[in-house]
């Protein structure tokens, strides 16, 4: 049985850290206000040279190093980002060049905070179909450059960073690999979370706009459905899950999903307190941390899930 195996994980965070206390000197907010509503204590903010390409390439190099693989052994680069360096060429192509990969193909996909789950789903389908044998899936985001820093309802929520995984065709030995992926969208809700502007629309501010209450309401219900779908598709129960690695948007949503699955708090990987919401980068950033510190190990069953603008949402089950 062919199975898409996760061989390496890597991540990159900008050097600069901005705490809630620092934000409180610029806007009408406080550390207590932010923590109570989001669970966020700090976020990493990119310097001028820390672009989506720069951070994504560094995360990719680290994923390759973790897997003991070279760039030219990779067939595809799939980048999930809402904050590309330019309209085109794709950030994926720029990363392909930056890591010294001279073969294969590269492209971006846009699914906002669900982008990494979408990327894993696309890569898994291509590997299973024989279109490629390996793929780097990268989430890289520079949200600090699209925020309205005078809007305390959004600017406190996001941070910058990148994460990457190397996926490769495997045999399914020990049931390892991507077991299933489940992705969805509903464009009727596109107006509750979006960037107001795009290339060629210079009269618009290109700032992130969000109806937080509506996003929260949909997140809880739609993520619950995606999680149930993943378990039912594989005749699994909540007790089979070793780790939940959710999109790191809000501590309340994360805690709600963990409780719904009946997981102990220590089975849920949480980085939102230190990274804030890094959109498509949040899941691979959290995966890398949990792999490096020894929590996620060979044989563990990991559930990832995310919801983002679109609305888009999805889940995936991966046996490490």
From Swiss-Prot:
Coiled coil stretches, renumbered: none
Gene Ontology, cellular component aspect: cytoplasm
Pathway: Lipid metabolism; fatty acid biosynthesis
Entry's Gene Ontology molecular function annotations: 3-oxoacyl-[acyl-carrier-protein] synthase activity; beta-ketoacyl-acyl-carrier-protein synthase III activity
Any GO BP: fatty acid biosynthetic process
Active-site positions on this chain: 113, 247, 277
Domain of life of the source: Bacteria
Entry's EC annotation: 2.3.1.180
Record-linked SUPFAM superfamilies: Thiolase-like
Region (ACP-binding): 248-252
Primary localization class, coarse: cytoplasm
Pfam families on file: ACP_syn_III, ACP_syn_III_C
Catalyzed chemical reaction(s): malonyl-[ACP] + acetyl-CoA + H(+) = 3-oxobutanoyl-[ACP] + CO2 + CoA
Annotated localization: Cytoplasm
Similarity field: Belongs to the thiolase-like superfamily. FabH family.
Free-text note regarding domains: The last Arg residue of the ACP-binding site is essential for the weak association between ACP/AcpP and FabH.
Function recorded in the entry: Catalyzes the condensation reaction of fatty acid synthesis by the addition to an acyl acceptor of two carbons from malonyl-ACP. Catalyzes the first condensation reaction which initiates fatty acid synthesis and may therefore play a role in governing the total rate of fatty acid production. Possesses both acetoacetyl-ACP synthase and acetyl transacylase activities. Its substrate specificity determines the biosynthesis of branched-chain and/or straight-chain of fatty acids.
HAMAP family attached to this UniProt entry: FabH (MF_01815)
The protein's assembly and partners: Homodimer.
Protein name listed in UniProt: Beta-ketoacyl-[acyl-carrier-protein] synthase III
Species assigned in the record: Acidiphilium cryptum (strain JF-5)
């Amino acid at each position: 049985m062919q199975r898409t195996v996760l061989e390496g994980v890597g991540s990159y965070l900008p050097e600069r850290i901005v705490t809630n206390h620092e934000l409180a000197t610029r806007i009408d907010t406080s550390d207590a206000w932010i923590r109570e509503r989001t669970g966020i204590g700090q976020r990493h903010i990119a310097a001028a040279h820390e672009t989506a390409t720069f951070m994504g390439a560094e995360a990719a190099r680290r994923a390759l190093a973790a897997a003991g693989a070279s760039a030219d052994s990779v067939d595809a680069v799939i980048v999930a980002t809402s904050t590309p360096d330019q309209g085109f060429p794709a950030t994926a192509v720029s990363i392909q060049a930056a890591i010294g990969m001279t073969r294969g193909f590269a492209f971006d996909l846009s699914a906002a905070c669900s982008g990494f789950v979408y990327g894993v789903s696309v890569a898994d389908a291509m590997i299973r179909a024989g279109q490629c044998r390996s793929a780097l899936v990268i989430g890289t985001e520079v949200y600090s450059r699209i925020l309205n820093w005078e809007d305390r309802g959004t600017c406190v929520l996001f941070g910058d960073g990148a994460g990457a995984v190397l996926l490769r065709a495997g045999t399914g030995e020990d049931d390892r690999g991507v077991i299933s992926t489940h992705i969805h969208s509903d464009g009727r809700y596109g107006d509750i979370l979006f960037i107001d502007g795009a290339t060629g629309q210079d009269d618009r501010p290109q700032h992130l706009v969000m109806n937080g209450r509506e996003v929260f309401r949909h997140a809880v219900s739609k993520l619950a459905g995606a999680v149930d779908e993943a378990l039912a598709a594989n005749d699994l129960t909540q007790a089979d899950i070793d780790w939940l690695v959710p999109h790191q948007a809000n501590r309340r949503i994360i805690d709600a999903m963990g409780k719904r699955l009946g997981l102990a708090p220590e089975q849920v990987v949480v980085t939102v307190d230190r990274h804030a919401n890094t959109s498509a980068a949040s899941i691979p950033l959290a995966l890398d941390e949990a792999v490096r510190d020894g929590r996620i190990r060979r044989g563990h069953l990991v559930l990832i899930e995310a919801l983002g603008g679109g609305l888009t949402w999805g889940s995936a089950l991966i046996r490490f």
